[in-house]
Regions:
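Sec/Tat signal peptide C-region and signal peptidase I cleavage site
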Residues: 20-24
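Polar helix-capping/helix-linker motif
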Residues: 5, 19, 83-86
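Bacterial N-terminal signal peptides that target proteins for export
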Residues: 1-10
Length: 340
């Protein structure tokens, strides 16, 4: 937990930076989080506050929380979360990030052909070309394994086969996610079959206060509880990024809704074909005023389920959390630079 009480003075001490919430008490808004006694003056100066999430009883889970301010309105920040392209920031090692239509088809993944020729992507191409269903190095279902095995047995251009088979798999995952079949989606993982929905539900239930805060939004997405309301419109994308020197392919969906004076957002990476089982990124955005101008206070929660985390204990698990905090901070800095 971080406690900030120092006021920030502008250069030359010309005036005191004044920050005022548009509601009665920002700290009461943050009561569900791991932050309290937050000094908005420090955040208005560009600081990013970060803490590890609460105690996670889910063995494969790790969670971090961040708090920062953006020089824009909440609606502008929410829109940027949907439309920004992390691939424009080389430090993040995102090779491709593409928006998708409401019902993606295999033809919408043609940009897979534009993945860079680097060692990270080479891992993914080689794992596809040499796929062995008896010893898979990438995370796929039994049916998807058959597609990959058939592709690997074919002759012809390896690049075309790579694009064709992954276009089919990624589009198929979106179809199931959007049409009520997400609960049955799975893939072979260490220790047996892994169901993406189970991983996501374990993550979101790890912190009861955060779950209650976002329950209404969760229940308007495909991860909703049984009998919950219909899903909100989804902002869909796919991407490829580096995980410890190896590339992964990801299907993701962003859902947003107002929550009184704030806006909530959940970004669900519901299919990841290597290294990680599932991730979620939660944001809540409130308006604040700084010297008479509206800015946005952003609370962010990053939740990750990965096979390697289950084997970490003590200082190793702590170190993993610290590395994750650094990665999240780099992502926030890149995102915030889009407003300059």
């Amino acid at each position: 937990m971080h406690l900030f009480s120092k006021s920030i003075l502008p250069a030359l001490g010309l005036c005191l930076l004044t920050v005022a919430p548009l509601r009665a008490d920002v700290n009461s808004d943050l009561a569900f989080s791991n932050f309290n006694n937050v000094d908005l003056n420090a955040l208005a100066d560009g600081s990013i506050l970060q803490v590890r999430g609460g105690l996670v009883y889910f063995q494969r889970g790790i969670i971090t929380q961040s708090l920062y301010m953006v020089d824009a309105t909440p609606s502008e920040v929410a829109a940027k979360l949907v439309h920004w392209n992390p691939a424009d920031h080389s430090k993040l090692q995102v090779w491709i990030h593409k928006k998708l239509p409401a019902n993606p088809k295999p033809s919408d993944f043609a940009d897979l052909a534009s993945l860079p020729n680097n060692s990270s992507v080479k891992f993914l191409r080689d794992a596809t070309a040499k796929f062995d269903p008896k010893a898979p190095s990438i995370q796929v279902s039994k049916e998807e394994a058959q597609l990959l095995a058939a592709s690997a047995s074919q002759s012809g251009d390896a690049q075309n086969r790579f694009v064709t088979v992954w276009s089919q798999i990624l589009a198929g995952r979106f179809t199931d996610f959007l049409n009520g079949h997400f609960s049955s989606e799975s893939y072979a993982g260490q220790g047996g079959e892994i169901r993406s929905l189970d991983e996501i539900k374990s993550l979101i239930h790890s912190d009861p206060k955060v779950y209650i805060q976002f329950q209404r939004l969760f229940n308007q997405t495909p991860i909703r509880a049984a009998g919950a309301s219909k899903s909100l419109p989804a902002n869909l994308y796919y991407q490829s990024f580096d995980i410890q020197g190896s590339s992964t392919l990801v299907d993701g969906a962003i859902y947003q809704a107002s929550n009184g004076p704030s806006i909530q957002s959940v970004d669900i990476d519901f299919y990841i074909n290597y290294g990680v089982f599932a991730t979620l990124e939660l944001e809540e955005m409130w308006p604040v005023t700084v010297n008479g101008k509206t800015k946005t206070l952003v609370w962010r929660d990053d939740l990750v389920s990965a096979p390697s985390i289950a084997y970490l204990h003590g200082t190793e698990r702590l170190a993993s959390g610290l590395i994750m905090l650094q990665d999240v901070k780099a992502n926030i800095e890149a995102f915030r630079s889009e407003f300059k």
